[in-house]
Regions:
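Arginine residue identity/basic-tract feature
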Residues: 21, 35, 65, 71, ...
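Detector for Asparagine
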Residues: 18, 53, 67-70, 78, ...
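Long, contiguous, compositionally biased segments that the model treats as domain-scale units
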Residues: 1-216
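Extended aliphatic helical segments
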Residues: 34, 47, 57, 72-73, ...
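Amphipathic, oligomerization/interface secondary-structure segments
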Residues: 247-464
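Residue-identity detector for glycine
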Residues: 4, 10, 44, 52, ...
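Internal, Lys/Arg-enriched amphipathic helical interaction segments that engage polyanionic partners
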Residues: 199-269
Length: 464
C-alpha cells in the first residue's frame, strides 16, 4: 500500500494506492463541498438530490508523490468510467501507472520482456558454453555473444502519425547475490521514438506490443513480466498496466506453438503498422491455448469472420467477375436509379432495396474455394491432406467450402432445427490455419516461410 498526495480537478487529496485501486481522501473542510458538487444534483437553495449525474475524471494523467519512496507516481486515468464515492472517499479508475524521479518525465524508449519473448527471440542462441570434460576440474565457461550479434535490425512503423523503431535484443543481468543466479538472460522487444510526455501514446504502444505477441503466439493470454521506460538521459521507471490476471501456459511454448522472430525478420514493421491501425483481425484467437481447442457457435462464426476480413484485404471480388457481368450490373443499377427518381412511397423503397442487391457478392463458400485455388497447391494442401487423412475425412476443397458456408449460416441465422454438420468441426479447425496463412501472405512473407510457420504453430512436424 502506497500513500501520498496529488491534485485532481482543482482539489488536493491524500491518496492510497494498492497497485489496483486508487482512493482519494479530500481535506476535511472540503469533503462536503466536493461530495455535493460532484455526486449530487442541486434542485433548490441548499437542496440536493442523490445520486447526481455521473462524474468522470477530467485529467488524462494524475501526478502524485509517494510518501514511502519520495518518488513521483504518474497515473493514467480511465476517463470513460465514472468516479465512485463512499463516505467521502473517492475511487478513481486508472489504466496504468509508473514511478519516476522527476515530474512529467519525457519518454523515448519502452522495452518489453516476458516469458513468450524468451521463446520468440530465443535466449539459448545468445551464448556459448565451453569446458574440458577430460580434465575433470569443474571449470565451465559461459560466454555471451556481443550486443551487435544478438540485436536485430531496426524496423519502422507508425502510431498516430509518429514513427517508431522496433528491434529485438537480449538483456544481460549479473548478480553476486546468493538468492539470484550469477547471470540472467532475457529477450526484449524495444520501441524507440521521439521524446514525448504523452503517456497515452506510451499506453497505445503497450496495446500494440501485446497484440503483436498475441498474433505470434496465436492466443490471447500472453503477458510481459517487465516493461521499462527510459529517455535520452537514462532509465525512467517501470510501466504497470491495470488489467485482469491471466492464465500462464507453458505447454504451447514447450510444444513450439508460436512464431519465432527469424521467420518474420524484416516484416515486423509491416505487422505492427497493421496492428496500430487495428487492421489485423485477432478477435478469433482463443483466450488461451486450451480455450482455442473448444469449438462452439461463437468461435465458429468468429473464425469465418476472420477469414472474410482477411479475404477482403487480399482479393478484390471484381477480379473474378466477367466483364459482361460488370456491364450488366452497371446497366441494372442505372435503370433502377431512374425508377427510384420517378417513384414515391413504398414503391421507391422497394426499388432502393432492389438496387442494393444488383451487385453480386461472393458467398463464404465461394471465397473459401477461391482461396484454395490461390494457395491450395503452394501452401495449404500439404497440411490439409495430412490433417483430413488423419481424421479419415476426404480432403476436397469444394466440399470443405460448402460445409463451412452452410454451418456458418445455420449458426448466424439461428437455424436450430438444422442438424450440425459433423465434418465442419474439422473444417473450421483447418480454417484457423488458412486465416494465419492469409495474414502471412498479406504481409509479404514468402510461401516457404509461411509453411514453416504453419508447421510450427500447429505442430504438424512435417518436412517442409
Amino acid at each position: 500500500m502506497l500513500t501520498g498526495t496529488l491534485q485532481m480537478m482543482g482539489y488536493e487529496f491524500f491518496f492510497t494506492f494498492n497497485e489496483e485501486r486508487l482512493s482519494l481522501i479530500p481535506k476535511e473542510e472540503e469533503k462536503d463541498e466536493i461530495r455535493y458538487a460532484w455526486f449530487h444534483t442541486k434542485i433548490g437553495t441548499a437542496i440536493f438530490a442523490w445520486p447526481g449525474n455521473p462524474k468522470f475524471v477530467e485529467e488524462d494523467f494524475l501526478y502524485g508523490r509517494a510518501n514511502e519512496t519520495n518518488r513521483v507516481i504518474t497515473f493514467l486515468t480511465n476517463k470513460h468510467t465514472q468516479l465512485q464515492e463512499n463516505n467521502g472517499i473517492i475511487t478513481v479508475p486508472i489504466l496504468a501507472y509508473f514511478f519516476s524521479y522527476s515530474d512529467r518525465p519525457r519518454i523515448s524508449r519502452i522495452s518489453f520482456s516476458g516469458l513468450e519473448l524468451n521463446y520468440i527471440y530465443p535466449i539459448n542462441r545468445t551464448f556459448e558454453i565451453s569446458y574440458k570434460p577430460e580434465e575433470h576440474d569443474g571449470k565451465i565457461n559461459i560466454s555471451t555473444y556481443d550486443f551487435d550479434s544478438t540485436t536485430t535490425e531496426e524496423q519502422k512503423f507508425n502510431v498516430f502519425g509518429k514513427e517508431v523503431q522496433v528491434y529485438f535484443g537480449v538483456t544481460r543481468t549479473t548478480s553476486l547475490s546468493i538468492e539470484k543466479p550469477p547471470l540472467t538472460l532475457s529477450s526484449s522487444m524495444i520501441f524507440h521514438f521521439e521524446e514525448t510526455q504523452d503517456y497515452s501514446f506510451v499506453r497505445e504502444l503497450y496495446r500494440i506490443a501485446k497484440e503483436f505477441i498475441q498474433f505470434l503466439c496465436n492466443r490471447r493470454n500472453v503477458s510481459f513480466t517487465d516493461i521499462r521506460l527510459s529517455n535520452n538521459q537514462g532509465k525512467v521507471g517501470e510501466f504497470n498496466v491495470i488489467e485482469e490476471s491471466i492464465e500462464i501456459e507453458m505447454k504451447p511454448l514447450k510444444d513450439g506453438r508460436y512464431i519465432q522472430q527469424k521467420y518474420i525478420a524484416g516484416y515486423e514493421g509491416k505487422i505492427l503498422d497493421d496492428i496500430a491501425e487495428k487492421n489485423l483481425y485477432l478477435r478469433h484467437l482463443g483466450k488461451s491455448f486450451r480455450d482455442s481447442r473448444i469449438i462452439d457457435a461463437a468461435s465458429f462464426v468468429l473464425r469465418t469472420a476472420a477469414f472474410e476480413w482477411e479475404f477482403s484485404r487480399l482479393f478484390s471480388e471484381d477480379e473474378w467477375k466477367s466483364e459482361q457481368r460488370k456491364i450488366l450490373e452497371e446497366e441494372a443499377s442505372k435503370e433502377l436509379e431512374r425508377l427510384i427518381k420517378n417513384s414515391t412511397g413504398k414503391l421507391k423503397k422497394i426499388y432502393k432495396d432492389l438496387k442494393k442487391s444488383v451487385v453480386s457478392y461472393f458467398s463464404l463458400s465461394q471465397k473459401i474455394s477461391q482461396t484454395f485455388e490461390e494457395y491450395g497447391v503452394t501452401i495449404l494442401d500439404k497440411f490439409g491432406s495430412y490433417l483430413y487423412k488423419l481424421n479419415n475425412i476426404s480432403y476436397n476443397h469444394s466440399e470443405i467450402a460448402e460445409r463451412i458456408g452452410k454451418q456458418r449460416n445455420n449458426f448466424a441465422h439461428g437455424n436450430l432445427d438444422k442438424e450440425f454438420i459433423n465434418e465442419s468441426l474439422l473444417d473450421v479447425v483447418f480454417l484457423e490455419q488458412i486465416v494465419l496463412a492469409m495474414q502471412l501472405q498479406y504481409f509479404g512473407i514468402d510461401e516457404v516461410e509461411t509453411k514453416k510457420i504453419i508447421n510450427k504453430v500447429f505442430c504438424y512436424n512435417l518436412i517442409v
